[in-house]
Amino acid sequence: MKVLLKNGTVINVFTGEKEKTNVLIEDEIIIGVGDYDDSDADKIEDAEGKYICPGLIDGHMHIESTMLTPAELAKVSLLCGTTSIVADPHEIANVCGISGIRYMLRASKHIPLNVYVMLPSCVPATRFDEAGARLSAEDLKM
């Protein structure tokens, strides 16, 4: 399905420029910015007075530090324009081990936020710390 966002202000995140224009989206992917008319789309959305920019990516975060489940984090992140996150689960891995990482993977699977889970590099955290779990390279083979 093609959706036309009409008369929105597109923000160029590289230059900071703003341009009032139209955006054509097909199956949730931006396929064009510029002059389009109503016949180009199946659905028309009036974006007058609204800003349009690409989805933002949080390149490093710890979901468990937010005290939210991945689904609840998705709700607040999407409201602020963040559509993707790269999650480092080292905190839950330090406490729960591989089962904590598996929980994060399962809980992030069917939510509207793109969650990319990296392998934690420090479980246990340091040689002076003991939080209850240990991971080896063998544990992380999935």
Regions found by a protein language model. Give the residues of each.
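Histidine-rich, glycine-flanked metal-binding segment
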Residues: 1-4, 10-54
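Short loop/turn motifs at secondary-structure junctions and domain boundaries
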Residues: 12-16, 66, 131-135
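Hydrophobic alpha-helical membrane context
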Residues: 19, 70-74, 100
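Short, surface-exposed linear patches
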Residues: 25-27, 32-34, 46-47, 67, ...
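Divalent-metal coordination cores built from histidine and acidic residues
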Residues: 75-142
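Short N-terminal helix-initiation segments at or just after the protein's N-terminus
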Residues: 28, 55-64, 90-94, 119-122
